[in-house]
Every structure is written in C-alpha cells, then in structure tokens.
C-alpha cells in the first residue's frame, strides 16, 4: 500500500495506491478503503484529516493521523499568519513497549526557497 500527500493551493490532496481520494458517502460519513493487505487495516478521510491503521505479523499496530492545519484569516489590516502546515501523528503499540510510543511531526511552511537548503 502506498500513500502520496501533496499540498496544492492551501488544500491537501491524498492518493492511496495511486488512486485519488474517493468521494464521501451521501450522508457525509468519511469514505473508507478496506484492504486485503494484512499490513493495512483501514484508511478513512474526514474533512482535511486522513486516518490510517497498519498492523504487521509481529503484532505491531501503528495508528496514523495526517491533518492539514489552516490558520484563520487575518483581521483587517493585519499581516496574514504563516501556514498552512501538515501535521502527522503516529501512535505505535507493541508487546515490547510498556506504553504506546507517540510521535508528532509538523511540517512548517518555508519562508523562501533558501530555507529548503
């Protein structure tokens, strides 16, 4: 299973196994992809958040949450805040760990091209 995430014009775009995000159900529930791959249990979208749960044969379970954080519009005359940001959270559970391991990554916007160097 592969997951591609791009940020275009302030919106996050997901492609799962090289397919675009499926539409939401008509009643507003997030769309869900079920996989027969034992590594990927499910992936679901809700607004600008993607939820993924993965497992493997050793019993490790990884819960992922990918979210686009967009700042509110600035007040009149104020400078716009930086953003948007892409946030990734991972929760890893395994029998070898006494407590789940939690990681949070936040991709901050670049001020200019020299920041990438």
Language-model segments: residues:
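PEST-like low-complexity, intrinsically disordered acidic/proline/serine-rich tracts
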Residues: 1-117
């Amino acid at each position: 299973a592969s997951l591609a995430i791009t940020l275009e014009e302030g919106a996050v775009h997901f492609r799962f196994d090289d397919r675009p995000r499926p539409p939401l159900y008509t009643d507003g529930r997030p769309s869900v992809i079920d996989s027969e791959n034992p590594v990927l249990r499910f992936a679901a979208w809700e607004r600008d958040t993607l939820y993924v749960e993965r497992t493997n044969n050793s019993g490790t379970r990884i819960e992922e949450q990918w979210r686009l954080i967009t700042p509110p519009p600035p007040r009149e005359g104020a400078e716009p805040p930086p953003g948007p940001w892409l946030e990734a959270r991972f929760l890893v559970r395994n029998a070898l760990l006494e407590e789940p391991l939690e990681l949070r990554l936040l991709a901050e916007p670049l001020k200019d091209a020299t920041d990438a160097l």
